[in-house]
Amino acid sequence: MVVSVTPRHSTGGDGIRSVTVLGSTGSVGSNTVELIEAYPERYRTVALVARRNVAALAGQARRLRPEVAVVADEAHYADLKDALAGTGIAAAAGPAAVVEAAQRPADWVMAAIVGAAGLEPTLAAARRGAIVAFANKECLVCAGELLMAEVRRHGATLLPVDSEHSAIFQVFDPERRPAVSRLILTASGGPFRTWTRERMAAATPKEACAHPNWTMGAKISVDSASMMNKGLEIIEACHLFGMPDGQIDVLVHPQSVVHSMVEYVDGSVLAQLGTPDMRTPIAVALGWPDRIATPGARLDLIKSSRLEFEAPDPLRFPALRLARHALQCGGAAPTLLNAANEVAVQAFLEERIGFLDIERVVEATLASLPHSELNDLDDVRTADADARRFASEMVAAGRGSR
């Protein structure tokens, strides 16, 4: 299960929880910072990490007063240092500095760096037994067995921040896992839920990022449009909750009110409901094991009285099939899936390939590269690099488009 039996360092001796936010200027990170700011009596910031948005990072640092602010892109180090001059806040840059920030003693770490780049800092936080609020599903997809082994070995606490896995976490009883019949992940269906394949072939990045319910970053918005996001979440749920692929189902739920469900063997189905606001699952993790108030709108069941559910269409959205196939193949297959998808999504956002070309790049990568065993982090890095190289060459050669 996700949570360790006896989590370490839930708060400091003064009752204040020290926190680090990895990926602080992204969608999840910005919402996390907003909640931390709302409770200055509960939280003290140790480190803030961003990829390259120095202006936003410096603004957050001036408000939260962390020990250090880190920009992953070393080219922006001078700008960050200048922006923090006279504040007493240390500035750092580069991948090693990101990992060092995760290693700093903080009770709670938000792991919100997008993509495989978040793996090493997430592992670093887990290895010192921190509470890790986990918003980076790609880490579990790339290296789920390795990460979960480190969580168990070091007594870390892993709390899901994806709305679906947070929902399951809130209604899943780990003491009665044999009584769980299945997990049901809900999906909005994204902006292309009713589109034909022909229409999707001409979709623009702007259309793919226009999610009907959620406000998210570009990459996860495209993944939602292709339903690859839900495929990655199936793999994530297997690792987080110890459930096999055959006991994890997906239902399309256009209203995004029921965030996911757990069905028990007696026929009972427990669900978590709420408005589509990422601040809610973030607050669940930030306050755990307590609850903290959020400023978002409350669910009005009368106005939301119509709740619809439908099966996903595997012909229009083959990403679900590809993700399940990678999970069943095991070894490096999920790592290849994730890396190829990241490359293809970026190429689509840059208008170098079409929307349906994303799945073609991913499928070809899975079919062409070996699904080797992953015994350590070096194996993960090798598989990830091989998949990125293959997918990038496919995009560059125009073989990803049709």
UniProtKB/Swiss-Prot annotation:
Residues where 1-deoxy-D-xylulose 5-phosphate binds: 137, 163-164, 188, 211, 224, 229-230, 233
UniProt-listed Enzyme Commission number(s): 1.1.1.267
The pathway is: Isoprenoid biosynthesis; isopentenyl diphosphate biosynthesis via DXP pathway; isopentenyl diphosphate from 1-deoxy-D-xylulose 5-phosphate: step 1/6
Q: Name one GO biological process term.
A: isopentenyl diphosphate biosynthetic process, methylerythritol 4-phosphate pathway involved in terpenoid biosynthetic process
What are this entry's molecular-function GO terms?
1-deoxy-D-xylulose-5-phosphate reductoisomerase activity; manganese ion binding; NADPH binding
Membrane-spanning segments: none
Q: Where does Mn(2+) bind?
A: 162, 164, 233
- Asked whether the keyword NADP is assigned, the reply is yes
Top-rank lineage group of the source organism: Bacteria
Q: What does it catalyze? A: 2-C-methyl-D-erythritol 4-phosphate + NADP(+) = 1-deoxy-D-xylulose 5-phosphate + NADPH + H(+)
Q: Which family does it belong to?
A: Belongs to the DXR family.
User: Any idea what job this protein has?
Assistant: Catalyzes the NADPH-dependent rearrangement and reduction of 1-deoxy-D-xylulose-5-phosphate (DXP) to 2-C-methyl-D-erythritol 4-phosphate (MEP).
From the Swiss-Prot or TrEMBL record, give the protein name.
1-deoxy-D-xylulose 5-phosphate reductoisomerase
Which organism does this sequence originate in?
Rhodospirillum centenum (strain ATCC 51521 / SW)
